[in-house]
Structure formats: C-alpha cells, structure tokens
Amino acid sequence: MYTYDSSGETLKIAIAWKIILKKPKGKNIKDYIEALRKGIEDQEHCEKYASTLLEPRPKTKKDVVLKNSNVTECVALKAKPFSKKIEDMDIFLLTNVHENLQEKRQTSGSLAHLDIEYTFNGLFRFLKCTADIKLKQTKVYEGADFLRIKTLFEEIFMFLKRDCKSPLVLTRLVELGDYVLDLIIITQSIMQNNANNGTGVISRAKFLEFYVFLEQLIFNKLSFASVEQLEKLLDQIVKRMKICFTYCKNDNPSIRLLYSECFFSYAEIYFPCLHSFDAQLSSAASKCVQILRDIITNEELQTDKQELSKSAYSAPSILLIGLKDMLFPEDIS
C-alpha cells in the first residue's frame, strides 16, 4: 500500500504502473504514451467545438441579405437522390407547384400570400416556356403528357377555388387570363413563320388548343369569384376579335392570315361562354355582343351586295358569315 507523498512521487508511480498494465503487448512504451496524449487532446478539442455550437451565433452579412430579401427562414435539407430520372423539367416543376398547393390545402384552412405567389409564378413560368419565340420548335408532348398537363392545371385551379375571392388570387387570375390571350397571338405568329420555313407546327397547334382550354377554365373560376372581373376579361376578348377583323382587310396576305387565325382562336373561347349553361357566364358574355353586332352592321354598310358577292371568299366575308352563325338571331337584327 502506498502512503500520501507531498512530492507526488507516489501518484506518478501509480500512473506509470497503470500504463504498463494497459499497454498492448508488442507496442513500445513511448509510442503508447504518445497515443494516450493524442487521445486526450482530441477529446478536449471535441468538447471545445461542441461548446461553440451551443453559443448564440453572431449575425453575419449573409443573414442581413436574407432578411432584406424577405427570406424569413433557411432550412438545411439533407441531400436526397431522385428515385428516377427527370424526363421533363417543365412538367416536373409544374408537378411541384401542384404538390405544394395540395399539401398546403390539406394542412391549413387558407393559403398564405407566399403560397399564392409561388403557385401563380409557377404557372406563368410553365406557360412562358411553351411559347418561347426563340425556339423554332416546342417540345413534342405525347397525348398522355398533355393529359397530365391539363389534369395538373385543373386540379391546381380546384385547390385555389376556396381562395378565388381573395384580392390576390383574383388579381393573379385576371393577369393569367390576359397572358393566355397574348400567348395565342405569339403562338399563331410562330406557327406562321415555322410553316413558311418548313418547320413543324403540330406541337404549337396542340398548345394553341391548350390555351383555349385554359382560358375557359379561368372564365369558370371568375364566374364563381367575380362577375365584374369576368366581364372585363370577356370584353378584352371581344375587342381583340374586333382588332383582328380590322387587320383581316390588310393588303399584306401574311397579316390577313395571322389575324384571321387569331380571330378564330378568340371566337373559340368566347362563343362557348355565350352559349354556356352557366347563367352567370352566359349573361356576362352577352353584354359584349354589341361590339360584334357593330362589326356586322358596319361591314354590311361599307360593302354593297355586288362587292360582297365578288369577295364572298375573302377573309372578312368568311368571318362575317361565322359571326352571324354563332350569334343568337335576336343579336343580329
């Protein structure tokens, strides 16, 4: 038994003896002691690092930038490999918009401002990619892909229905409706240029049909949300039809063809609204009939019967016949 030694020799001997007992066989005593020292240093370093993580972190310049850009929270997400290859980035991002909106709708009563902005920004982004004038040819989507796109838009609008009457959703819906009307002219122009250059137009034509479908979808939501905004958007369509009819008389055959096709696209949107079983939608569309009635009256006054027979197959005459067929008899008289 060792007794207390003020010089510490007894403690040193005890430690030395413990080291000798624990030292692995075949290992030099000096190397073993160095390894023990390194282990103690590593442990102290880990404890010191852990204590710094618990201390409040001072704000950095990056934090200030994030605050100024309205980013309220940064979440570090673990890297997650995709389970399958992304075949089409545009559809993938549109699907993300759909899934985010679906999740928000299931977990909360109403949508937050950022959720609404994220949704409509995603819709605008997708539509912009479908009518990029820099691309001679759009992506060729098969029937199943187009059905998927239509379904995504339909369900997104269904998720938005509960918030359709909110000022932000209403404003963005009208903006989207105006944008789709612009896309029709852009797409018709691209199709005409592609046809002249011998480039395919089938994929563009499919998207043209999709724009008509989407605009009618927007009208259905506005019919539920705001009759006033619905009437304004319908008025925009009819006024565009009037402009198209005017350009159909242009001396340039390319301009006549372009605006004739645009007239038909707008008519394909407007007249189903006029003849709709939705009383709200039909009533709103009927308030714009006067503009079309004036087109017929003015054209018949400017063209006598002899000239009308000579130009029976001209663009204005064909459009005039179409207008008379699509309007109610009481609207023509």
From Swiss-Prot:
Instruction: Assign the protein's first listed, main location to one coarse class.
Output: cytoplasm
**UniProtKB keywords:** Chromosome partition, Cytoplasm, Meiosis, Nucleus
Q: Which family does it belong to?
A: Belongs to the MEI4L family.
The family database entries (InterPro entries) matched by this protein are listed as: MEI4
> What is its subcellular localisation?
Cytoplasm; Nucleus
Q: Which organism is it from?
A: Schizosaccharomyces pombe (strain 972 / ATCC 24843)
What's the name of the protein? Meiotic recombination protein rec24
How is the quaternary structure described? Interacts with Rec7, as part of the meiotic recombination initiation complex.
Q: Which GO cellular component terms, listed alphabetically, does the Swiss-Prot or TrEMBL entry include? A: cytosol; linear element; nucleus
Kindly state a single biological-process term from the GO annotations of this entry.
chromosome segregation
Q: What does this protein do?
A: Required for correct meiotic chromosome segregation and recombination. Accessory protein required for Rec12 activity, which is involved in formation of the double-strand breaks (DSBs) that initiate meiotic recombination.
**Per UniProt, what is one Pfam family of this protein?**
Mei4
Q: Does the keyword Disulfide bond apply?
A: no
